[in-house]
Amino acid sequence: MAADLLDVHGLLFKRQQYKEADLLAKLWTKELGIVTVIAKGGMRPKSQLAAAVLPFTEGTFGILTRYKGISQLRTYKKLSQHDELFTDLDKNAYLSYLFDLADHAFSEYQKLGGYYDLLLVAFNRIVAGQDPEIIAQIVQLQLLDAFGVAPQLGACVICGKEKGIFDYSIAAGGVVCSDHFRSVSRLHLSPKATALIRTLALLPISRLGEIQIGEDLKKESRRAIAQIYQATVDLHLPSLRFLNEVRGS
C-alpha cells in the first residue's frame, strides 16, 4: 500500500525517545484518530522537528502514513504551545492522565467522533485555569461509553423514574431511585454526589460554565467514579497513580 502525505490537525500528547536521536510521539487527531509518528532526528538540538514534538503541542502535522502502524512526521505548521504546562504539575498530571485514559479507549486510526472535541475542549479548559478535577470527572464519565460500559444515568435503571433521590448501583449499571434502594447493592452516595455525577456525565463539556463545587463533594464523586472504573474497565495506569500522588489522594 502506497503511503500518503497529508495534514492532520490535533495535539501531541505523548512522546518517548526511540533509538539514539529519534522520537516516537502520539497525536490526537481529528482526521485519523490516535496516530503514532516517528520524528527522525527529533532528539537532535538542531532538528527542524524539535518544536513540533514538545508535549501538548497543538497544530497541523504533515505526516506520511499508510493508515496503520507507525507514520512519519515530516512537517508542521500553526503550532500552539503551552510553556506553563512544564512547570504546573497539577495541570500536567491531569492532562497526562486524561489523554492516557483516552488512549486506552480507542485503537489507533479509529475515528474519534465527538470524543476528539471532548478531549480538546477539556485540554483548553484546564490550560485556561478551570477546575481540573471537574473537567477530569466529565471526561472520565463520558469516556465510559467509548469503553463500552456506559451506565444509565438519565433515569432509574429499574423503573425509569427521572426525578427524585438517586444512588448509583454498579451491579445494576446506573442510577436507582429511592423506591428501589433495598432491591440492589449501591454505593450509598449522598444525593448531591449522585446528582453531580449525573450532571457531569450528561452535560456537553462545551456548555460547562464557571461552577463552584465543594471539595468534599468533589472527593465523594471522585471516589465513586474510581469504583465504577475499577468494576467495569479495570485499568491500572501509571498516569493515574501519579495524579493521585499530586492531588494527595
From Swiss-Prot:
Source organism, top-level taxon: Bacteria
UniProt keyword annotations, A-Z: DNA damage, DNA recombination, DNA repair
Gene Ontology CC: bacterial nucleoid
A Pfam family recorded for this sequence: RecO_N
Coiled coil (residue ranges): none
SUPFAM superfamilies assigned to the protein according to its UniProt record, in alphabetical order: ArfGap/RecO-like zinc finger (SSF57863), Nucleic acid-binding proteins (SSF50249)
GO biological process: DNA recombination; double-strand break repair
Role description: Involved in DNA repair and RecF pathway recombination.
HAMAP family reported for this sequence: RecO
Family from the record: Belongs to the RecO family.
UniProt name for this protein: DNA repair protein RecO
